[in-house]
Amino acid sequence: MNTKDTTEVAENSHHLKIFLPKKLLECLPRCPLLPPERLRWNTNEEIASYLITFEKHDEWLSCAPKTRPQNGSIILYNRKKVKYRKDGYLWKKRKDGKTTREDHMKLKVQGMECLYGCYVHSSIVPTFHRRCYWLLQNPDIVLVHYLNVPALEDCGKGCSPIFCSISSDRREWLKWSREELLGQLKPMFHGIKWSCGNGTEEFSVEHLVQQILDTHPTKPAPRTHACLCSGGLGSGSLTHKCSSTKHRIISPKVEPRALTLTSIPHAHPPEPPPLIAPLPPELPKAHTSPSSSSSSSSSGFAEPLEIRPSPPTSRGGSSRGGTAILLLTGLEQRAGGLTPTRHLAPQADPRPSMSLAVVVGTEPSAPPAPPSPAFDPDRFLNSPQRGQTYGGGQGVSPDFPEAEAAHTPCSALEPAAALEPQAAARGPPPQSVAGGRRGNCFFIQDDDSGEELKGHGAAPPIPSPPPSPPPSPAPLEPSSRVGRGEALFGGPVGASELEPFSLSSFPDLMGELISDEAPSIPAPTPQLSPALSTITDFSPEWSYPEGGVKVLITGPWTEAAEHYSCVFDHIAVPASLVQPGVLRCYCPAHEVGLVSLQVAGREGPLSASVLFEYRARRFLSLPSTQLDWLSLDDNQFRMSILERLEQMEKRMAEIAAAGQVPCQGPDAPPVQDEGQGPGFEARVVVLVESMIPRSTWKGPERLAHGSPFRGMSLLHLAAAQGYARLIETLSQWRSVETGSLDLEQEVDPLNVDHFSCTPLMWACALGHLEAAVLLFRWNRQALSIPDSLGRLPLSVAHSRGHVRLARCLEELQRQEPSVEPPFALSPPSSSPDTGLSSVSSPSELSDGTFSVTSAYSSAPDGSPPPAPLPASEMTMEDMAPGQLSSGVPEAPLLLMDYEATNSKGPLSSLPALPPASDDGAAPEDADSPQAVDVIPVDMISLAKQIIEATPERIKREDFVGLPEAGASMRERTGAVGLSETMSWLASYLENVDHFPSSTPPSELPFERGRLAVPSAPSWAEFLSASTSGKMESDFALLTLSDHEQRELYEAARVIQTAFRKYKGRRLKEQQEVAAAVIQRCYRKYKQLTWIALKFALYKKMTQAAILIQSKFRSYYEQKRFQQSRRAAVLIQQHYRSYRRRPGPPHRTSATLPARNKGSFLTKKQDQAARKIMRFLRRCRHRMRELKQNQELEGLPQPGLAT
């Protein structure tokens, strides 16, 4: 059946034949009218119906291109006659700045690909699109649709207009005049109503253009978006939080001594202070490179700066070097910004003026900070503590005590950790005058009154991480207004709308900052080499803050042997060369903003920097898809944790008030601020520990689940934040209280949320290694529970770039214990969200603590325990799988199986994690043996060393030892090599008492704690006594005689031989298994090949039989036809001869009448003629059938193989 119909299109006397699918013509109706505008996108069916209504195209076609069609316009063009792309709008261009960036795709109608689409985006307003469609069979007729699709808030109203990020086009349209901007923006916003912050329903495009001209002077281009949501059109005082992902704070690309700009937005425009004199020449200038200053700039201000010098200060009155402070106070932005409805808590009426402080340290003799650990790309890729400010990571604490005291609750603005990754990647941070940080520190201070802190309460100061130096006071102004302001690296909730500061708006100031520095300050910032290559393109150009997105980067990369890496704002991640010119990497986690992206090699940077974007998620509404589900919002999750604990505490208070169970223990300390920095987990742990002794309650009612919890339990939230100590404490609570259904519902490692994600899935997706290992050791079944998309935790960890976490869990999964860990069995889980029974309660290990490091906290008697590493200095390599064990000794491996499981040497060389308990007391099982699998590799290496150190005379086969000990010692005095190579044995024997053993400590024949362990020199002296003449007379009987050395050598050979045989046996077994697999696969291959061959032969035979049969039929029909034809010819000949033959002689008497004779002949003739005609018709019909059969046989048959 023909599936395509031909349609002729008459086009100015040209007839064009178009083949369209018949199904398409049948299912789509013809449109009598083309709408001139539509404020929504057309469906594929509507587009196709417009394009197949060929008879109306002459009426609908536009003969000339329209200049700047308004929003919603639908126009039909003929691309051969009209250049429709020249419409007067400025569209987004590619990185070369020449060609327009277009997105192409094919569209389906009723499952058939018949449409082609080409999309472009406006360079001024990114929500304004031009979409062009045409039929694949008729590409000349193009349907063009212009539409502005604004981002919608949760309330359903349109968010404020958003402008594009930094690009080459932005520099062009910012140079336009007011009339040109009006001409561009007016048609874009046709038919759109915006909600404003002061409650008005409409806005004026003229106000918008005026605001653009005011906030973006015609100077160097600003580097971030001009967020127009920061004020109202009138005098409205409603506070506002812009939830648009286009409003960003730039994370600067700076060196350790370069400028670090952290902008703290504000909700209201500040009042302009008077203009002060310019910068004094005697003030020391900050050093920066052009690249760092340009990439750390933000949107500028329309007014000049207030510049005031401040006297240098030092701690304790001493002046060991000056600290010059430069205060740059920015002026207000214009009012009239458009604001949607605020969703967060309002704040008091502020009186702001924003100041930018440049602190230039000039102390060259400050003590250096402790060096940072060795750089590891996987550590930066996966660790939540470097370059990532959510998930419980350690942020940068402010260096000013006044600011610490005034630090107000704000988790969204808490990050500001641009110093953290740069210090980790480039070396130790510089020290300040009094031992704190030294260097150029840019920050923005909001000089608000202290009334803002009334609604929140003063929060306790957040302790700095252990490696950070003590803070030093540095007053910013003579009036000391810091104490009344907000924290320097944070602000109150909702204070996020102040337009960021732009250094690029002030070229004179930048020129002074880039000029020569004071001679006492070195300049470690490397200058870019002019030979750096250029990144031609990279995709995608943005990621969410959790990272893990695959990024492809194109450029002149051709060396396969080069070790490439990609640097995202000083966070280096490994990159692989997919093909010549294309690099692949996975972006790390980072805070929201624009960051620099650079390709580096072994020697240093290989390319110039480009801008990569981290976009914030919109968490005010629930994620609608599984792909957006495993994401994180600090503030919301921490609030959920506190709300859950508050519900449980209320429940306990109700039961205590009803007199069911007396409430025990002290009241929980109030947690005043929701989600401050590193101390939040510690405060929540204290709160949970205070609830444990008074939690002996049982109730039939369950906790109320609110909608923000997304079906996540308390353990889900703790795992998502990476709170390992909180998970530990919750497991201890679960082990104490085993009969509570409410607690089981909240603390169950097999519980799932709305998208079937377990707590382990959350920890793996967000890269929290310690939390993931704790949850895995708690219940291994969680590793095999997929989410609603069928993804397992390990696959999610791999796909998000958390490679080290996935390897650690795979290693733990391979080390399946032969004995079950001593976990106390809890009752089967009856949680409604989980259909699995869970064995999820760990028993209290000895002293009731669920310590992470109890198996590795043992130390020799009399020696202090190893100092724990601070959490900020621990690398991923330090966190071996065994270190994160929950105190349960692993099952012993076989002797020879160790080499496959541990290739990095004994675990005793790894540093220990800090103990999980707050009081720092070591558990009772601290002296328990370490992992048993250390012994095999030591025994093998010991045997090897013994064989190498044994003298050659001992190794001979004809060895005969002398009976006298003295003689044997005299013979061995020349064996200097033995004493030189036996030092390893001394260190081994020194630690052999602490190596694990398969017998319990109670079965040992002596008390371990009562015997003093000999030191290494003692062992060396004992072992070297057999090769030197020292102490021969006293210790002759204690040294190793020749026979003993021979026995030791034979034992070492036996061990080595057994190990080699075992390795050979394992290799032989593997080869036999491989051979069996190959044979089985080959047999199956041969069997399948024979089956396929037989099938092909059968198919050929069938086709041959069909061909023979058809040929025989045609041959038989042809033969019958020829016989019939010959018979007809004979009949005709006989009839003709019969007609010519003369009649019989005339008989008078017996003759018939002439009339009767004529009628008889006529009847005979008629019968013969009828027979002949019938035969001819039959022959003609058979000839037609034969011809049709021959035509069918002549056609190529697709199924036949020749």
Swiss-Prot record:
Enumerate the residue ranges of region (Disordered): 263-322, 361-409, 421-491, 817-874, 906-929
| ANK repeats by residue range | 712-745, 757-787, 791-821
Among Pfam families, the record links this protein to:
CG-1, TIG
Q: Which SUPFAM superfamilies match?
A: Ankyrin repeat, E set domains
DNA-binding region residue numbers = 30-155
Q: What is known about the tissue distribution of this protein?
A: Detected in brain. Expressed at constant levels throughout the cell cycle in neuroblastoma cell lines.
Q: Where in the cell is it found?
A: Nucleus
Q: What keywords appear on the UniProt entry?
A: Activator, ANK repeat, Nucleus, Repeat, Transcription, Transcription regulation
Which stretches does UniProt call biased (Low complexity)? Answer: 289-299, 313-322, 826-846, 906-917
Annotated motif Nuclear localization signal, positions:
79-86
Q: Name one GO molecular function term.
A: chromatin binding
UniProt record similarity statement? Belongs to the CAMTA family.
Name of the featured protein: Calmodulin-binding transcription activator 2
To which species is this protein native? Homo sapiens (Human)
Q: What is the phylogenetic placement of the source species in the record?
A: Eukaryota, Metazoa, Chordata, Craniata, Vertebrata
